[in-house]
Amino acid sequence: MSLLTIELQKEKRAGVIPVLIAVGILGAAYALVNFFVRKNTLLSLPLAPMDVLLTQLYGTLLILNMFGIIVATCMIYNMEFKGNAVKKLYMLPVSVPKMYLYKFLILTILLLIAITLQNLALIKIGMTDLPQGTFELPTLIRFAAYSFITSMPVLSFLLLISSRFENIWIPLGIGVAGFLSGMALANFDLAILMFHPFVVMLKPAVAMSAQPDKSIALVALTETVLFLAIGFGLANYTHYE
């Protein structure tokens, strides 16, 4: 049995897979119900219909995704930390850094699935509820890709934190603190705040346009790779809480 298959079974048993799939389904349901209830109010806003569709619904979807990431990353090392099992892995013919990469890959794919489910709901809304001729599928795809990319630094950062601490309350506390501080700082247009992964994730939600910001996307990709590289490097060492 391959290490990837083992990881998939562990994440399913730990509840990681159901959590992020549920986030996708819940987000899609929220978008459909919210637009159905507030359709006239939303379409009366002084914004282009595509900007209304993407920016006015994305805030809550982002919060769902963010807390889904926080919960999933807190749970993903649960089995390894039981009975100090993670320390025993170093005595087995198992590559712990490779295991870390597989966890990152699984979380990334699950987040992508969740965002895809949510955007399928937005496509349905755009095709049936926006004024005739105003729905632009390429614009939605670009924004979906942008929101996925800007979410990755938080995922990469929290996986790193979760891998280093056995106490689940530490990554959970850091995740909640990151969310609260990110909410407080996201509206400030200061370059130094881009070092804050939660601020990066929140940027699409505070923008009034559905057009992706290439500089923010570049920062997000850089931070994702940086946190992944640090986590991969630290996985070679057995120092845990």
Summary of predicted features, one role per range:
Residues I76-T108:
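Helix-loop-helix units of permease transmembrane domains in multi-pass membrane transporters
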Residues Y77, V86-L89, A121, I125, ...:
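Hydrophobic alpha-helical interface/terminus motif in multipass membrane transporters
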Residues F67-F81, S156-W169, T224-Y237:
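Transmembrane alpha-helical segments in integral membrane proteins
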Residues V19-I25, F165-M183:
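Pore- or pathway-lining transmembrane helices of multi-pass membrane proteins that form conduits
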Residues G24-I69, L101-E166, V206-Q211, S215-V219:
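Secretory targeting signals
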Residues M1-G24:
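Aromatic- and glycine-rich beta-strand/loop motifs that create alpha-glucan
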Residues V33-L53, L172-E241:
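Terminal transmembrane helical anchor/hairpin motif
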Residues M1-Q9, Y77-Y90, A144-W169:
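Cytoplasmic juxtamembrane interface segments
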